[in-house]
A protein has these predicted regions:
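Cofactor-/ligand-binding subdomain signature composed of acidic, glycine-rich
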Residues: 233
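Intrinsic-disorder/low-complexity linker and hinge segments
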Residues: 89-90, 217-224, 272, 372-373
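Short flexible/disordered coil segments
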Residues: 119-126, 190-201, 320-322, 353-365
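Small-residue-enriched alpha-helical segments and adjacent helix-cap loops
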Residues: 2-5, 21-162, 167, 171-175, ...
Length: 380
């Protein structure tokens, strides 16, 4: 079996444990419940200008990442973020706080997320990418986003806890959510879900192992809501960003409009907005062609990248039909879109490989394509 041409880290960067990339340190800030107050958002923008290169990424886990931070400025950045209430006491605490919360949260959802956050210290030692999903808004919106332990609602509104990969969930009372999450995490470890520090709930469930007793699944979650798109919603204005990246100036402008809910869809919800903001660089409509493509940072921003990809992806976006997806990856790791796409282009040492209906790690249909001459016409 061939060795992969990329390195799998097995952990996610944080603020206290940043990751070195091609443009400096990547410092990931994990807002509580995915929400930034206006003061916090303005502070993050200022910190990105002062300590980084002024670019801010939205991660697939609803976090914000400051790019281009130097090792010399990291300590000062942490001090600024700590003053904003965005930093945990220790890196181990930060690593545990892998909690994705629906941006359409009500008071009950925010309270559940707070209880879960307080319970993380009672969790067993879990793999670095083990995550919790709080999807208890008016309707589930994270059906296509992986987690490990999920809080959802039944069709009648009752609260549920579900293992990723399981069809049915267990009913749980509001005041028992944190205890149930701890118990389910303990069961995951005891049932053999962790091997050499790694493991995911879906893999364990896929082996036919399932919890028993009060955590046994017996109720189906409510049907998922339609996919979120840019535009006005009941809670405010959803705005998107090409490749999930904005400038510090854009973040500062958004902060002036209202509190921000960071989503895993490369979008931000501006709470309470009743009109779409008139700011440069925002995606405001569902039919924008840039929403039909996914691309990672590419070279030179990523150390593992074999080529620049974003300019190429932006050029090709106009040729992607509505309802189709093009994924352009700078290596076979496929960070921007781990799953299959209608077309995937993967950078190699000799050009780009093309994969139809697969992921970046699948066998190519065409190899060594020149980025200057790639033409998507007739391929979809």
């Amino acid at each position: 079996m061939m060795e992969p041409s990329f390195q799998v880290q097995g952990w996610c960067p944080g603020a206290l444990r940043p990751m070195m990339s091609g443009d400096g340190l990547v410092v990931r800030v994990r807002p509580q419940a995915g929400r930034l107050t206006q003061t916090q958002a303005a502070g993050v923008a200022a910190a990105a200008r002062t300590h980084g290169n002024g670019l801010i990424d939205l991660s697939a886990r609803g976090n914000v990442q400051l790019r281009g931070v130097s090792t010399a400025s990291h300590s000062a950045l942490i001090a600024d973020l700590r003053a904003l209430g965005l930093i945990d006491a220790y890196a181990t605490d930060e690593a545990r706080r892998n909690v994705l919360v629906t941006p359409f949260a009500d008071a009950a959802t925010d309270a559940l997320a707070a209880r879960l956050g307080a319970a993380l210290a009672r969790m067993p030692q879990l793999p670095g990418k083990f995550g919790f999903v709080v999807d208890t808004g008016p309707a589930p919106v994270f059906a296509g986003i992986a987690g490990d332990i999920r809080f959802e609602r039944a069709a009648g509104g009752g609260l549920l806890i579900r293992c990723e990969g399981a069809t049915l969930a267990a009913p749980v009372a509001e005041d028992e959510t944190s205890d149930a999450a701890v118990e389910l995490a303990q069961w995951f470890v005891a049932a053999g879900g962790v091997t050499e520090g790694r493991g995911r709930m879906a893999a364990l469930i896929g082996r036919g192992v399932a919890p028993e007793g009060r955590l046994a699944g017996s109720v189906a979650p409510a049907s998922a809501a339609p996919a979120a798109v840019p535009g006005l919603v009941a809670e405010g204005a959803l705005v998107g960003f090409a490749f999930g990246q904005m400038t510090a100036d854009t973040m500062a402008a958004l902060a002036a409009l209202g509190p921000l809910r960071i989503t895993p869809w490369r979008m931000v919800l501006i709470e309470g907005m009743r009109a779409l903001p008139d700011l440069p660089g925002l995606i405001l409509t569902a039919d924008d062609p840039i929403r039909r493509v996914e691309a990672c940072s590419g070279a030179p921003a990523c150390l593992q990248a074999l080529a620049p990809v974003r300019a190429l992806t932006a050029r090709l976006a106009r040729d992607v039909p509505a309802g189709k997806l093009l994924h352009v990856s700078a290596c076979a790791k496929g960070c921007a879109h781990p799953g299959p796409a209608d077309l995937t282009l993967v950078a190699t040492a000799t050009g780009f490989d093309l994969i139809r209906g697969g992921s970046a790690q699948d066998t190519p249909d065409q190899r060594a394509l020149s980025p200057e001459t790639i033409d998507l016409k007739g391929l979809f």
